[in-house]
Curated annotation (Swiss-Prot):
It comes from Streptococcus agalactiae serotype III (strain NEM316). GO terms for biological process: cell wall organization; peptidoglycan biosynthetic process; regulation of cell shape. It comes from the Bacteria. This is Glutamate racemase. Keywords: Cell shape, Cell wall biogenesis/degradation, Isomerase, Peptidoglycan synthesis. Pathway: Cell wall biogenesis; peptidoglycan biosynthesis. The active site is at C73, C183. One of its GO terms (molecular function) is glutamate racemase activity. It catalyses: L-glutamate = D-glutamate. InterPro entries: Asp/Glu/hydantoin_racemase, Asp/Glu_race, Asp/Glu_racemase_AS_1, Asp/Glu_racemase_AS_2, Glu_race. Provides the (R)-glutamate required for cell wall biosynthesis. Coiled coil: none annotated.
Length: 264
């Protein structure tokens, strides 16, 4: 048993969708989360800069003595996960492989769509993973650069959100039966995305799928938290306004949290 926390990182608040699923599936585990809101979104940035920012968050989490790191950001996973995984001596998970695997299991038509940030789509990481596992699966990718700013500005239920999602996703409607939400911000827009795509399209939340892998690794390495040892509580950090982060986080997680601002 291991009472150390699990570290989560993201470019902003999107990774909270993974944390929410973590609270549901593994409530005994302690979470330390950092969101780099001051520099979000990561999607339009060059790969080297994304790699640098991701390492800064990783190094911050390491100072908190975490037992595992979850890169709860598709863009950072696509650019930096492999390198970080190879250099650290604790488990490091990304969100792309779990989402790709779930999509393959879900599709009946063999037609899968991926929506993500420009960098995630440019990296081609999802398509490569899917076609390595299932070569006959047809994959179409679409960058959605306007989605993250809508979530980060807490406009998920606005008429603007509905308009942007409809206009962005229209080219995909009727062309697939499974759609990967290839950015951890996107589940916060899930009701609108589902409405645009149609009830028959299965939406894959890569973050939720990742939590299943977290559970497997905790058991494999025997580093689960013991229910009998009460943990020190969850800790949330942002590089921007704690007030803005707290508002979105409490709304999404349905619980009060404490948020600290840090400078990386």
């Amino acid at each position: 048993m291991d009472s150390r926390p699990i570290g989560f990182l993201d470019s902003g608040v999107g990774g909270l969708t993974v944390v929410k699923e973590m609270f549901r599936q593994l409530p005994e585990e302690e979470v330390i989360f950092i969101g780099d809101q001051a520099r979000a979104p990561y999607g339009p940035r060059p790969a080297q800069q994304i790699r640098e920012f991701t390492w800064q968050m990783v190094n911050f989490l390491l100072t908190k003595n975490v037992k595992m790191i979850v890169i709860a950001c598709n863009t950072a996973t696509a650019v930096a996960w492999q390198e970080i995984k190879e250099k650290l001596d604790i488990p490091v998970l990304g969100v792309i492989l779990p989402g790709a695997s779930a999509a393959i299991k879900s599709t009946n038509s063999g037609k899968v769509g991926i929506i993500g940030t420009p960098m995630t789509v440019k990296s081609d990481a999802y398509r490569q993973k899917i076609q390595a596992l299932s070569p006959n699966t047809a994959v179409v990718s679409l960058a959605c650069p306007k989605f993250v700013p809508i979530v980060e500005s807490n406009q998920m239920s606005s008429s603007l959100a509905k308009k942007v999602v409809y206009e962005t996703l229209s080219p995909l409607v009727g062309k697939l039966d499974t759609l990967i939400l290839g950015c951890t911000h996107y589940p916060l827009l899930r009701p609108i995305i589902q409405n645009v795509m149609g009830a028959e399209v299965k939406l894959i939340d890569s973050g939720a799928e990742t939590v299943r892998d977290i559970s497997v690794l905790l058991n494999y390495f025997e580093i689960n938290h013991n229910w009998q040892n009460k943990h020190g509580g969850h800790h949330f950090y942002t590089t921007a306004s704690p007030k803005g982060f707290k508002e979105i986080a409490e709304q999404w997680l349905s619980q009060e949290i404490n948020v600290e601002r840090i400078v990386l």
